């Protein structure tokens, strides 16, 4: 009888933290899977340093083309693009490249003190209205960490 109680107590002690973890972290894990979006592949002119500005929901602009499963976001030499496509909601693993002709060089978005080249992403709502919705502006900085800090 004592063995059954000891076993029951051990199961309770081990399972309690697991159950608490499921109740606390479970909704966040489920949210990650429910709010995925198609990833974007950003093509930035080779050597460009500065703010990238992508304006979405622009009535007279073309939609974003696709490259496999990616939305292809090719910005001009001034770091801008206007598209009639909507800014997708959710999370995805976006890719960032410098491009020149047909060659591409991957840019790291590793983060602080890790050699990253993509910084400070922001989403703004703009006053111009398309189909009853304001346009959206996505901005991020391309350059070294030092360049971003001096922006």
Predicted regions and their residues:
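N-terminal Sec-pathway targeting helices
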Residues: 1-22
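Protease-labile, long low-complexity intrinsically disordered regions enriched in Pro/Ser/Thr
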Residues: 23-151
